[in-house]
């Protein structure tokens, strides 16, 4: 069990990459109209019979380059936002421990010089009434991007997509959870881990009171009708809580209702300040003070207010100490970039005749066109790319107070 949930969670058992899941075979997509990564899919009664699609081999999809097929073509490029900085003027990452105000709680950033591992999940829901077209492509493009831009080895990637016929590579709930556990197993300081999900997302009633809107965000495995969805609280418990200080986890969610899908406490605006006091509910003046200090750009003052709040609840009753755990802060370096706000849908798009998730495309294109940029410029550039055609607004959240002007690395 994890704090406040009233639900069974998933213990860290040191699982290897997924093995022994039920066998599924997938027929080719039927060409559904352009839609949204909403959820859950209606009328999905299990995968159709037959071999996997023959045109979905990995070699068919080249890596997304600045001039590559499907990227950077078809009209003038939008103006990129660079935070008025040259690449050399960005702040570099400091790996020294940093304190949450005047408490004993600390966090530590990663310089990403250690091991690199990635878990990439893409689900098209072949044969369902809400079939998607771009999710499998997203994963193939992302794996190539991670390999060529950041040096991730294909041997250190677990790829779960529903166009495969190997039972341990199908994105069932069991396989996804076991792969999440594999991702964080034996994590060390300065390691860099990536989790990418493209598929249907949704919301379910919040059972532990940690969501302001009263709902938890969820993702839908390919077998969700039989096995159920995966809740943000569980993803946090599996992938965030076990991480040591100085270990980096970058999570990318290209799905609906994904703004806080990893349940991280700090949500940032395009101005580089905390946009929502998402960290505490009914926490009183300390939380409000922290939020106002961030709005004024006073990071030191904000951290001091945060420290006052944490110290107050830590020194109070055991039930309040439980609230500290539920804050969802972490000593590790965890960042989540999501395709839209919690109340928005995320587009399943066609970019130059290539099916893709709009958010996944925007992330890869932004980083390909401008490899050296800050977290702030990345968030703004993604929004600039998307705003011409899509209403969704990418979100960035973190497990700690984030300097939005440091260099984005993963």
Swiss-Prot record:
Superkingdom of source: Eukaryota
Region named Disordered: 1-94
Annotated Pfam families: Peptidase_C14
Gene Ontology molecular functions: calcium-dependent cysteine-type endopeptidase activity
EC number, UniProt record: 3.4.22.-
InterPro entries, sorted: Caspase-like_dom_sf, Metacaspase, Pept_C14_caspase
Record GO biological process: apoptotic process; protein quality control for misfolded or incompletely synthesized proteins
Biased composition (Polar residues): 80-94
Disulfide bonding pattern of the chain: none
Compositional bias segments (type: Low complexity): 21-47, 55-64
Keyword tags: Apoptosis, Hydrolase, Protease, Thiol protease, Zymogen
Start-end of Gly residues biased regions: 65-75
CC per GO annotation: cytosol; nucleus
Active site: residue positions: 200, 256
UniProt cross-references to PANTHER family, sorted A to Z: METACASPASE-1, METACASPASE-4
Family: Belongs to the peptidase C14B family.
Role noted for this protein: Involved in cell death (apoptosis).
Name recorded for this polypeptide: Metacaspase-1
Organism whose genome encodes this protein: Meyerozyma guilliermondii (strain ATCC 6260 / CBS 566 / DSM 6381 / JCM 1539 / NBRC 10279 / NRRL Y-324) (Yeast)
High-level lineage: Eukaryota, Fungi, Dikarya, Ascomycota, Saccharomycotina
Primary gene name: MCA1
